[in-house]
Amino acid sequence: MKVIFNADDFGLTQGVNQGIVKAHLDGVVKSTTLMVGMPAEQHAVQLAKQLPDLKIGLHLRFTAGRPLTGERNLTDEHGVFTAYRDFWQRRDYQPEAIYHEAIAQVEHFLKLGLTLSHLDSHHHAHTHPQLAPIIYEVAKKYHVPLRDIGMAGEEAFGCRYHFTDFFYDQRLGIDPLMKHLLELKERFDLVEVMCHPAFVDPLLEKCSGYAKQREEELHILTSAQLIQLLVAHDIEITDYSALISAPLHSCV
């Protein structure tokens, strides 16, 4: 079985960026997704350009920060994206607004001089029933894979693929992670593990309720024990680059 450890939130804060880089250089992370238009975007880009083996995707934003397009249909009265707690209840999004914002974020990413490996989204926003079909079309337009959510048992990317958000908060630990991966190994060829390694900084503590746990994730993802166990169980660490030319399947 192959596993993609994808680090979300690249570009959120400098501490997040530095944690992701350490998880790449000293650990199992070979893939990350950048949040364009966020405070540490340029810092992330500078780091990324020094790391040719770190594959960079786009972490689409529809629940954090401000839209690049200024589309009012996507925001609250202050011009900020609809808060996460309200986002999932909304059913009045305009398809054109969603499409234009997604395209703007992809184009912004490309203008940074980075190679786009795949798409996913902050808070899994691309699985919202109004966003899902539109973001799928955006992924097709740019010929990149789109993170698959909740398709256990079905084929994606031409193989038995599964996305897991198991490695999070109360479930953090080498033993639970390995147990989970070995269970998945029975059924899947490719597993993507969502992760959030970081060094906690003041901005992260201010903007995220998930902060201290990120340092625990970083410790685990750079653990020699984890790397040895993956090798011992014939689990290969990979990234999205092998999937660029693979068939693109719907994420929902």
From Swiss-Prot:
It comes from the Bacteria. It holds the Pfam family YdjC. Mg(2+) binds at residues 59, 122. The keyword Metal-binding applies. One of its GO terms (molecular function) is deacetylase activity. CDD domains: YdjC_EF3048_like. Its EC number is 3.5.1.-. The keyword Transmembrane helix does not apply. InterPro entries: COD_ChbG_bac, Glyco_hydro/deAcase_b/a-brl, YdjC-like. GO terms for biological process: polysaccharide catabolic process. Its cofactor is Mg(2+). Keywords: Carbohydrate metabolism, Hydrolase, Magnesium, Metal-binding. It is an enzyme of class 3 (hydrolase). Homodimer. Probably catalyzes the deacetylation of acetylated carbohydrates an important step in the degradation of oligosaccharides. Belongs to the YdjC deacetylase family. This is Carbohydrate deacetylase. It comes from Vibrio cholerae serotype O1 (strain ATCC 39315 / El Tor Inaba N16961).
